[in-house]
Regions:
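Conserved beta-strand hairpin/beta-sheet module of binuclear metal-dependent hydrolase folds
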Residues: 2-53, 135-150, 168
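C-terminal regulatory/interaction regions
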Residues: 232-240, 244-289
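Cap/insert and terminal regions of metallo-dependent hydrolase folds
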Residues: 157-253
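Metal-dependent catalytic neighborhoods of phosphoester/phosphodiester hydrolases
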Residues: 74-83, 96-100, 230-237
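Active-site environment of divalent metal-dependent phosphoester hydrolases
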Residues: 22, 69-73, 94-96, 131-132, ...
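Active-site metal-binding motif and surrounding structural segment of the metallo-beta-lactamase
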Residues: 43-90
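Metallo-beta-lactamase
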Residues: 90-144
């Protein structure tokens, strides 16, 4: 059944297209434009997953790159070449990732200085991670804020400040401390993961959530779970015990999540998306029940 929805004002729509060491890509948009944060899966998979969700590639106006690790950039060259998307990336990340784009498509950003993409405002801030110049992002529109907080070795003061502003967030919960300790990784890799410039553990993420989540937060998408040192069931149970009115979603390393509608009105609950089809001159969009 085909449905058309004229979006209500004052909403953002978010989904994780993939989240994990095999590739990361996050979509945040309003009813007219959207951005991707990272493109760590192939262009073809981005297209397929967005199509399944009823999201139009034509709404994407830019890609923001958090850092140069391959699970965040490996789909970027083909995606940008095909669609000519502007790429917001720092020079150090460009060099470290050995990336090369048309000069006209290259855009820089500066920490804590908002970038306007249509009605969207994107603010980057530095984070602790073992990359050359890594950043997290806040995407906002009409006072609705979405955070993309993954690949973080430890919560910094900026993360805590921005988390308190979020109506929804993609938050890393990479590993269970006991599973990592008892697992088969070599000691150097264990220390890299938990050493302050690697990844957030479930407990670190939970502490941030409990202490700093604002009353108006409606959705938390737990992201970048380790395949070997975590369990979706474990981390969801852990967070649900403290969620109160926040909807907890575990982002998958194998498929896209639903599209979630984030509103200033916390009582607005979206939800499963009816897949749609774009036909010639008629642009169809998401339909929510």
């Amino acid at each position: 059944m085909l449905k058309i929805l004229f979006f209500a004002a004052m909403s953002l729509f978010i989904t994780s297209l993939n989240s994990g060491s095999n590739g990361n890509c996050y979509y945040i948009g309003n009813d007219t434009e959207a951005v991707l944060v990272d493109a760590g899966i192939s262009c073809r998979e981005i297209e397929r997953r967005m199509k399944r969700l009823g999201l139009l590639m034509g709404k994407i106006k830019a890609v923001f790159v958090s850092h140069e690790h391959s699970d965040h950039i490996k789909g970027l060259p083909v995606l940008v070449k095909k669609y000519q998307f502007p790429v917001y990336i720092t020079p150090m990340t460009m060099r470290s990732g050995r990336l090369n784009f048309e000069e006209s498509l290259l855009k820089n950003f500066i920490a804590h200085e908002p970038v306007s993409i249509g009605g969207l405002s994107i603010t980057a801030f530095p984070k602790f991670h073992d990359a050359s110049d890594p950043y997290s992002f806040i995407v906002s529109d009409n006072n609705i804020c979405i955070g993309v907080f993954t690949d973080i070795g430890a919560p910094c003061i900026h993360l805590k400040k921005y988390f308190q502003q979020c109506h929804a967030a993609f938050l890393e919960a990479n590993y269970d401390e006991e599973m990592l300790e008892k697992g088969g990784y070599p000691i150097y890799l264990k220390n890299r993961i938990r050493g302050g410039k690697g990844h957030l553990s479930n407990n670190q993420a939970l502490e941030l959530f409990i202490i700093h989540k604002p009353d108006f937060m409606s959705h938390l998408l737990l992201s970048n779970l380790s395949k070997n040192n975590n369990s979706p069931e474990l981390v969801k149970e852990l967070f649900n015990a403290h969620a109160e009115n926040v909807k907890i979603i575990v982002a998958s390393r194998y498929e896209e999540t639903e599209v979630f509608r984030i509103s200033l009105n916390k009582s607005v609950k979206e939800i499963p998306v009816y897949h749609t089809v774009a036909k010639s001159s008629l642009q169809l969009s998401l339909a929510f029940t």
